[in-house]
Amino acid sequence: MDIFDPASFTSIFEKISKKLDKFSEIKHYELYASSIKETTITYEEGFIKKAFNKKSSGLGLRVIGQNGKEGMTFTSDYSDSAINRIVRDGRIMMRVSTENSEFKNLAVPSVKYNNVEDIYDPEIDNLSLDNIKEIINPIFDLKKRKIPPNSLSGNFSSIVHGVYIFNSNGIRKNYKKSYVNVNSELSLIDYNGFPSSGFSWQSESHLKDLNVEKVAEKSYAMAHRGLNKISVETGKYPILLSPLAVAFFIVDPISKAVNSEAIQNRMSFLADYLSKEIGDSSFTLKDDPHIPGKLNTTSFDCEGSATKPITIIDKGVLNEFYYNSFTAGKEGIETNGHASRSHYTSNVGISNHNLIMNEGRESWKDILAGIKKGIYFDYTGDSPNYVSGDFSGLILTGYLIEDGEITKSLSEALIGINLLDAFKKIETISKERKWIDEAYVPWVKLSEATISGRK
């Protein structure tokens, strides 16, 4: 069987559907199949440690009976005996499951589906291990630097992903998409024997858009710039967020907080803020699933509902939440196409598509030049408390700003602020933007935030 052939899955789905239709206790059913072709090279200490090609495929079945009782089962075997087993097991699990009066319906076919472009690249599909070894040479070349890395690791992956959806309401959707990812992690040792780490990565839907030389250079530059770190005095400083920091400190927390499941369960700091001002009027954030060639571009979500562009934050006002069919049904509204599944064995969740933050009018370098003393915040590995919005974390990569210039790297500096306060303290947004994975984001200046140092 060709695991990327829609006709093969249509045949399997129709076979299962005929079996399910015989059982009157089954009111709804959904079949979700996923196929993956992956080619990966992992390297450590500058040498290839592991390399593999693999293909995998599987199918998940959800059956829902009276009063929302649901059974879920799955298989990676498409034989007749395996199909009979998942139908049998799904019915058994449905019978013994808890009633769910909040379930209203599975997704229904949308009136219109937008065609999307450039989500599949045959160059990625045809990559071999030898091709990849050549592509990642710029990372290995870092060992030739005057100050060579003390350690060097990372990986390169190419993925082709097929999804096939079929349900009892008439949903019949499929797609095939591709992406590549490369990352580089290294450390350098300063003259006092203290390490400084650097990292960079890039993920793209098309091989031609991948710039491994830039990834290698950025990881080395970060580590080199971090040598001979300094401590800063505790206090309030103006903060200039890099696009990387904006993506992970501002945009990503919002995308998680507008998940309607979290909202309905009172597990989001934005639960009470719909149609209310949550940030500066200069701040707008959109979700656009139809941008050609981007990582999260898709015509439909993982339930088969049509996707559409939405404005999450409009001039500082919280405008919309993300919904799947279940959470939308609880509120008596239509889903806006944000159902997600990480795997054919996983439950239906909610996630974002492509996130677009608005641009400003000033160059980021002009914004920097206007800061007498402040902090350039590039990256933290910490996450906020999504219930309260409080954030207190280590600035893993950050620098002191002095007289409008980025100078020394920071050591053991912590940033503390509530995210709602951070949104309201947005003072300036740059006119330049960069893609960080699926987010298109600018530089952002916050008027102030508390920085805790060791001095």
PLM-predicted stretches and their roles:
Residues 1-298, 302-305, 314-317, 405, ...:
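Active-site bordering "gate/hinge" segments
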Residues 273-455:
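Dual-mode signal for accessory low-complexity, basic/Gly-rich regions
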